[in-house]
Amino acid sequence: DTILWKTERFVNGIDFLRKALKLDNVHIMGHSCGSTFLIEYMITKQPKGVKSVIFSSPHISSPDWMADAKILLSQLPMSIQDTISKYEALKNYTAPEYLVATDSFYARHLSRKHWPIHPNVECENVPGFNDQIYEYMWGPTEFNITGTLKDFDRSVDLDKITEPILFMAGEFDEARPETMYKYQKLSRNASVEIIENAGHKTMIDQPEKVYEAVSRFFNKVENNK
């Protein structure tokens, strides 16, 4: 039901979860599109009890995301660029050649490990990825936003967040490190951690380094009470 596929529903879900689990005081991390809902939560709800926020490989602004994607696409071999341009002009996102070309992008910037990534078999009873929601709200690929989030942009509202912020991204992330430093300058109290040799899926590429970065941030927040 596409009526339910709205930003507000996912934002409200954060409140529902906090109330159900009685999470009065929290540090909240949103990864990728999770950061979209997290920043919307912080701006529209102005929630109490949030000690800090982590925007991990964040989608804060669709214009910024597409600008980053354009830069990263321009670094691909010209043959791959031409293939992507050809099929996007035709709006044919299922052609085998196009899928191979997009996988080349993903292998560089989505995950630095073997692509495609196989699901974690240890996560039992976890439903598969919902392509319908992804395509409706986002689009056909990571670098082509055609869905309801196409015009999303909260970067101008970052200075409204008074809680400590950590912007974290992979060295080769779709959310480019340069953009993280841009967001830091737009924020009141923010720091940046760049995870070496990681793509967008930082917690898969470099889980130990992510843990260390988050721990440093938490210690900094707790020590500055």
Annotate the PLM regions.
Residues 155-198:
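Conserved loop-alpha-helix segment in the C-terminal half of the alpha/beta-hydrolase fold
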Residues 189-225:
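Catalytic active-site module of serine/aspartate enzymes centered on a nucleophile-bearing elbow/loop
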Residues 51-93:
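Flexible "cap/lid" loop of the alpha/beta hydrolase fold
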Residues 19-25, 47, 162-163, 189:
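Active-site acidic short loop of glycosyltransferases
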Residues 24-68:
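Conserved hydrolase catalytic core segment
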Residues 18, 41-42, 184:
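A conserved amphipathic alpha-helix that caps or lines the catalytic cleft of carbohydrate-
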Residues 1-33, 212:
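Active-site loop/oxyanion-hole signature of alpha/beta-hydrolase fold enzymes
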Residues 74-75, 81-163:
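Alpha/beta-hydrolase
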